[in-house]
Amino acid sequence: MSSVAEDNSFTCDIATIFVAICRNPPANPSDSLFQYEISTLYQEAHSRWLKPPEVLFILQNHESLTLTNTAPQRPTSGSLLLFNKRVLKFFRKDGHQWRRKRDGRAIAEAHERLKVGNAEALNCYYAHGEQDPTFRRRIYWMLDPEYEHIVLVHYRDVSEREEGQQTGGQVYQFAPILSTQNVSYNQYIGDSSDIYQQSSTSPGVAEVNSNLEGSASSSEFGQALKMLKEQLSIGDEHVNSVDPHYIQPESLDSLQFLEYSDIDHLAQPTTVYQRPENNKLERCYGGNFGAQYSAKNDSNKLERCYGGYVGGAEYHSSNLMLVKNGSGPSGGTGGSGDQGSESWKDVLEACEASIPLNSEGSTPSSAKGLLAGLQEDSNWSYSNQVDQSTFLLPQDLGSFQLPASYSALVAPENNGEYCGMMEDGMKIGLPFEQEMRVTGAHNQKFTIQDISPDWGYANETTKVIIIGSFLCDPTESTWSCMFGNAQVPFEIIKEGVIRCEAPQCGPGKVNLCITSGDGLLCSEIREFEYREKPDTCCPKCSEPQTSDMSTSPNELILLVRFVQTLLSDRSSERKSNLESGNDKLLTKLKADDDQWRHVIGTIIDGSASSTSTVDWLLQELLKDKLDTWLSSRSCDEDYITCSLSKQEQGIIHMVAGLGFEWAFYPILAHGVNVDFRDIKGWSALHWAAQFGSEKMVAALIASGASAGAVTDPSRQDPNGKTAASIAASNGHKGLAGYLSEVALTNHLSSLTLEETENSKDTAQVQTEKTLNSISEQSPSGNEDQVSLKDTLAAVRNAAQAAARIQAAFRAHSFRKRKQREAALVACLQEYGMYCEDIEGISAMSKLTFGKGRNYNSAALSIQKNFRGYKDRKCFLELRQKVVKIQAHVRGYQIRKNYKVICWAVRILDKVVLRWRRKGVGLRGFRQDVESTEDSEDEDILKVFRKQKVDVAVNEAFSRVLSMSNSPEARQQYHRVLKRYCQTKAELGKTETLVGEDDDGLFDIADMEYDTLFSLP
């Protein structure tokens, strides 16, 4: 009994000392019971945040450390830097992108004053990465004015597990036990928080508050001592008098977990409990364990997650303890390896015996590996006996409950399913620690009301609409939607409605929630299901696409008769006699009864396809609608001018682009110009050339469309584009060659030619050379003979047209120059001067004569008074003297100014030209006489010919020449040429062909002196 009393009194003394230290902590770490190792702190800075006492110790001992004189550039995680703010002002410019305030200027740094003991000692500023929210920065300096210029900066990349533990709202921890040997300062001084520790010789409870206020009265201190004595008593009657679940919560920034390696062992076991109103026990061994307890028949359950999930195992607090081996005295029984191995076997057997009861006979395969890993990696073991430095699990947890949002995920009845899901290796399921972090958020910023759809196929992205309401300003941070552990951004469609895309994932159910940019939970958790996409779709979707003959002949016949009934309107037949000739033109193009019977017959015979039949019916419907539209806009008996507005005349461009040849002629009949241009200068021929409509191009050329028309200049095409260049850029080489040939021949026909025999011979020689080179390169196949013949004829026409156009411009320039020279020679022989000089003299004489009469008007008025001979003679003498005096005055003034000018020129010559530039100056200067002969390069017509005519002609001829090298282009040219001849015949404008074998081309060689010809 005496030994027990001594132990009891010794424990009370320890508690008294502990409370006294809490009331009056040391002023700085140098006065504490433990001195920190700087090298150890630098190593631990890579894996955890430093505690306020450790930071204070580094700042106070900065003189023995090296200060950084330059700002770092993108320091890595774990960097610990010391700065002097007075020397390096911009130490925050470290190259990283930090989250900024709403204005985007200043960095959004959170500020907090940290306590060492119960006194504020440090300033701390927190910053989060903009692109990587897990990368953090903390800046510390002391509140002491003497040391406030010394700054400690700590960079860390927080892992998901650590971030979840630190951002989960109120976090609870195991408090380390108090030892009588080698107690460090940071083991009993909290970081501006409360740490409660308990110690007893029996399964009792001890509680100590380390954050007692300095202004507490003596009565409070007495009550604390009284409670401490009761809790440290030996008897078991005081066990139930103390709250068995109490543990102090700590805030995010002040939470610091003590190292288990610094805890010494006591002779008696120790137990730590939580507060009942929180009903949650988390955090054991460095954050790798998550524990959950519930009471059933006075038994305790421990559900743990360490690289996996173990659920359903029942443990009794009377025979299960968590022991750390090797950290206390060697004489402890709990530290022996034999008993430790035996205890692991006992725990494994208990786990295997109890798991089937709670998981319906399924034993997790990771249980043995979990326990073996714990024993190998961490020196922690399970023992069946009471040993020193142990944590006992509580015996009475009947009131322990989980939050509603958490119980839905890890409730005891769902443990088996969740364990199986984790064992199957789900890619998107949340691990246990992440669930603890997500569900532990206390700041809800969004309320989910509905999710549509709430499922999607596993291997496809699904667009998901979430309806809810924001409980804060949506613009205050970046938001994301989390599907399991996959985080995707979303967009706010309108207030309370957001949209995102569910990522691809394996089949199964995952958690869906709204998170902020740093991964914090901001809403309740819903489920989203991923389903396997079935191989067979619905019957309608599985049907093959409609083939060319998918519609039955009976259905096609019914469709044809239905359209025929709609188009055979009796009222329109009654008004046919009132229609004009232009309206009857489109009516003639419509199908008659014979055509309808022919279409029905082809359907019955099976020779008509459904696609062609439907297209023909659509064309007939469009014909009827176009007839109605043109009739409504036609004027009564007035077809001289166009009856359509400028906007309505643009229909010709639509028709040309679509290739509706049947609609082209009725539109022309209503007065629309064939070369009508749109806002960009495009005509119908440009639109038809862009889409490669061969029939429409032939119809436009036959109707007189200009093949050389150029579009309006633009940034992309400063010189504009012709229809041939548009066709060539879209890959229609045959069409481009045909249009180029037509443009060249039309250009040649618009010129008035007076060719000589020499120019004709030159064009003929050039044409023969081109044709010979093409004939040598072209194949001699029979199927390509017809198209090759047409192509050679096109090249011949284009080559002769290009040569004759260029020769015509050269001849025109030559004639103009000769005419000018002949006129100059004629004038020089007759008058001794050129015509230009004569015209200038005559103009000056007129001006001089007029001015002279004005100047002599005063003299004439004077002469009227001196009509006598003597008076007139005196006047003339006086005037002569006055003129002489004026001449002398003017000469004197000119000579005076001339001297000044000569003086200035001499100064300029000597100072600038000779001395400064080291030249000869004006000595020996002779002005060059400008040549009056006009050079040929200054001829405006020649410049125009070089810039416009020659370039356009060469490009057109190159297109025709390149057409001959492609068989497809030759075939296309042959089709367009043949269609042109047919169109001309249909319009009654056929032209005389050269011979029966000729395919409608005129031979330019046979048109020697024609001043005007039109050749398409």
Swiss-Prot record:
Cysteines paired by S-S bonds: none
Cellular location(s): Nucleus
UniProt tissue specificity: Expressed in roots, stems, leaves, flowers and siliques.
Annotated SMART domains: ANK, CG-1, IQ
Post-translational modification Phosphoserine, affected residues: 935, 962
Gly residues composition-biased segments: 328-338
Ranges where the record places region Disordered: 324-343, 753-786
ANK repeat ranges, renumbered to this chain: 647-676, 680-709, 719-748
Keyword RNA-binding attached: no
Inducing stimuli: By heat shock, UVB, salt, wounding, ethylene, methyl jasmonate, abscisic acid, H(2)O(2) and salicylic acid. Induced by cold stress.
A biological process from GO: regulation of DNA-templated transcription
Residue range(s) of DNA binding per entry: 38-164
Domain IQ, residue spans: 798-827, 855-884, 878-907
Main localization, broad class: nucleus
GO molecular function: calmodulin binding; DNA binding
Region (Calmodulin-binding) location: 903-925
Keyword line: Activator, ANK repeat, Calcium, Calmodulin-binding, DNA-binding, Nucleus, Phosphoprotein, Repeat, Stress response, Transcription, Transcription regulation
Function: Transcription activator that binds to the DNA consensus sequence 5'-[ACG]CGCG[GTC]-3'. Regulates transcriptional activity in response to calcium signals. Binds calmodulin in a calcium-dependent manner. Involved together with CAMTA2 and CAMTA3 in the positive regulation of a general stress response.
Family: Belongs to the CAMTA family.
Protein's name according to its UniProt entry: Calmodulin-binding transcription activator 4
Native source species: Arabidopsis thaliana
